[in-house]
């Protein structure tokens, strides 16, 4: 059981490391702690925190840095969101208050505003995507092994693309595959359809197709076209500012994930959207890939009958969580207000 002073030391180590990026030693803590404590006492407290796995020693310094477990404890029990500055709040209101002709423009601008305010990478999922469901899928033969794939959603949107079907897939096999799609996936939100394409649907198709890849490519591409426009990413290049040369592999992983199909991005954001407060997931907790040196802060925003969207910040593990959590909480409220005002023009 940690003492109040030891928790105060942990909180201060995280604050100082977040601000400087440098390991924190007992002398620095003695100067910065809001209570007078001897250097020896601080060293004992640091030893207790290290034994608990909350801080760790670096090879290049006698100071300590927070561990992933330490960050998690801090986020679960100690973090206190900081109030957004007047300047940042004014910027958010001014930028979101501009004239927009489409909902997508507001959501697209939101990630630019957030990435500019934080210097991190912002990701947003528009509210309507949570309500868009698959209502039908069919293939129309065009001859010469070509088909037109038609995907229909409950908001009246019809996506169609022309594809070349591999000669190895017969028309009977295609019909069986289409029946599986309509039996298993119709009525589901597009984000869930995308996830099932990566999990259990391929094994179902294997019962009728020698290789389901050709059919999955056709269906997956037209599905991506129907939903990908609802995802927006701002500040991609900001990743390069806090991932050094030694993290080039991590940079490649996250870039490929952002550019992949929207099912991967949905999984990164935590799956189908639910109304939740601001949440933080650390690198090892992220899916579908472990991003060891990164953290993701997510927050949902509710637009009444028009659905629930999500806004997220992707940044380094040592980001200032108190400030970012406070900012994201206010930002989602302002974004929800702006979208509600936008929809009010159509609901009258």
Curated annotation (Swiss-Prot):
In terms of InterPro entries, this protein maps to:
DeoR_HTH, GAF-like_dom_sf, HrcA, HrcA_C, WH-like_DNA-bd_sf, WH_DNA-bd_sf, WHTH_transcript_rep_HrcA_IDD
Q: Which GO terms describe its molecular function?
A: DNA binding; DNA-binding transcription factor activity
The entry's keywords = Repressor, Stress response, Transcription, Transcription regulation
Q: Which GO terms describe its biological process?
A: negative regulation of DNA-templated transcription
Where along the sequence do coiled-coil regions lie?
none
Signal peptide residues on this chain, from the entry's feature table? none
Organism domain of life: Bacteria
What job does the chain carry out? Negative regulator of class I heat shock genes (grpE-dnaK-dnaJ and groELS operons). Prevents heat-shock induction of these operons.
NCBIfam families from the entry? hrcA (TIGR00331)
Q: Which family does it belong to?
A: Belongs to the HrcA family.
Q: What is the protein name for this chain?
A: Heat-inducible transcription repressor HrcA
């Amino acid at each position: 059981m940690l003492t109040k002073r030891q928790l105060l030391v942990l909180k201060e180590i995280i604050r100082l490391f977040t601000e400087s990026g440098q390991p924190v030693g007992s002398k620095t803590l003695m100067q910065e702690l809001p209570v007078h404590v001897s250097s020896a006492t601080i060293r004992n407290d640091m030893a207790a925190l290290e034994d608990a796995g909350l801080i760790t020693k670096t090879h290049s310094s006698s100071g300590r840095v927070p561990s992933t477990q330490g960050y998690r404890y801090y986020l679960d029990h100690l973090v206190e969101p900081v109030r957004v500055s007047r300047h940042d709040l004014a910027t958010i209101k001014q930028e979101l208050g501009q004239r927009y002709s489409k909902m997508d423009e507001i959501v697209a601008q939101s990630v630019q505003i957030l990435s500019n305010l934080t210097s991190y990478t912002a990701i947003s999922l528009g509210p309507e995507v949570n309500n868009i469901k698959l209502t039908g899928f069919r293939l129309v033969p065009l001859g010469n092994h070509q088909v037109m794939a038609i995907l229909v959603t409950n908001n009246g949107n019809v996506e169609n693309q022309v594809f070349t079907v591999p000669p190895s897939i017969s028309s009977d096999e295609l019909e069986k595959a289409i029946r599986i799609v309509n039996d298993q996936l119709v009525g589901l939100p597009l984000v869930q359809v995308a996830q099932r394409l990566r999990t259990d649907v391929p094994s179902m198709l294997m019962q009728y197709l020698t290789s389901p890849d050709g059919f999955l490519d056709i269906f997956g591409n037209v599905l991506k076209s129907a939903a990908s426009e609802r995802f927006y990413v701002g500040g991609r290049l900001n990743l390069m500012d806090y991932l050094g040369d030694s993290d080039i592999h991590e940079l490649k992983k996250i870039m490929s994930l952002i550019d992949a199909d929207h099912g991967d991005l949905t999984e990164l954001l935590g799956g189908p959207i639910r109304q939740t407060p601001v949440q933080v997931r650390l690198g090892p907790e992220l899916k579908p890939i472990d991003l060891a040196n990164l953290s993701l802060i997510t927050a949902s925003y509710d637009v009444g009958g028009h659905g629930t969207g999500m806004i997220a910040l992707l940044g380094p593990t040592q980001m200032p969580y108190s400030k970012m959590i406070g900012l994201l909480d206010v930002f989602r409220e302002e974004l929800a207000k702006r979208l509600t005002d936008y929809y009010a023009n159509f609901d009258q």
